[in-house]
Amino acid sequence: MNTTPDTPTPRALRELTPLEARILGVLVEKQHTVPDTYPLSLNALTAGCNQKTARAPVMNVSEDEVTTALDGLKHLSLVMEGSSSRVPRFEHNMNRVLGIPSQAIALLTILLLRGPQTAAELRLNSARLHGFADISSVEAFLDELAARAQPLVVRLPRAPGARENRWMHLMCGEVNMADFASADAGGGADSVPPSEFEALKAEQKRLADEVTRLNALVQRMASELGIDVDTPGNAS
C-alpha cells in the first residue's frame, strides 16, 4: 500500500515523551476536525492535550509544559511555529519528517491519542481523518509502518478472548512484548482489558452517585409531603 508522501526520505528520530506524542496527535486531529482554527494557538493546543474524550490516557498539563514540549518538537522539525499572527500558532510537519502518506499519518494519530487499537477500531476512529475502504487497507498501511527500518508501530500479542490483535505506536520507544505476553498468559478467557475495566469502574461510580442523588430527592419530596419513605440508603 505504497503512496508517495511529501518527501520520500524519512529521518531517524529520538524517542518522544508522552506529551510530545500527544501534541503531535492533537495537531493532526484538529487540522482535520477544526480546520478553521488550525494552526493551533497554545491555548487551543493545551486544551486539546487535556481533552477528556478520545484520549488515553487523559492528561492534565499546563501551557508551560506544552511550551517546553513544543521546543523539543520544533528542534526535531516535527512542529513549526507560524509567524503571520500576533498569537503564536503551531502546525505539525509529520508527513515530511517521517516520510509517510496521509493515510498512515491518520492511523498513527489515533494510536498517539487513544493508545492500542485493533485495525477495526482504527478504521472507525480515524474516519474523520481519512476514510479507509476496508480493514484490509488499514492493515496494509500498518504493516508498512511496522516494516520500516525504524518501525513506527507494532502488532501486540492477542489478548485472551480477543478476536483481533491490537496495534501500538513506537514513537515513545520500544514496547516490552514480554509484558504483554505474560499478562496474556496469566489471564483467562473472561479477562477484561484494563481500559475496559476502568470504564466499568467509572460507570459503576456514576450509577452509584445517581442513586444517591435520587435517594436524596425522594427524601426531600417525602419530607415536604409529610410521608415516611424507606430508601435503600436508609434501610436497616
Swiss-Prot record:
Listed Gene3D superfamilies: Winged helix-like DNA-binding domain superfamily/Winged helix DNA-binding domain (1.10.10.10)
Species annotation: Burkholderia cenocepacia (strain ATCC BAA-245 / DSM 16553 / LMG 16656 / NCTC 13227 / J2315 / CF5610)
UniProt name for this protein: UPF0502 protein BceJ2315_62050
Disulfide bonds: none
Family: Belongs to the UPF0502 family.
Source lineage: Bacteria, Pseudomonadati, Pseudomonadota, Betaproteobacteria, Burkholderiales
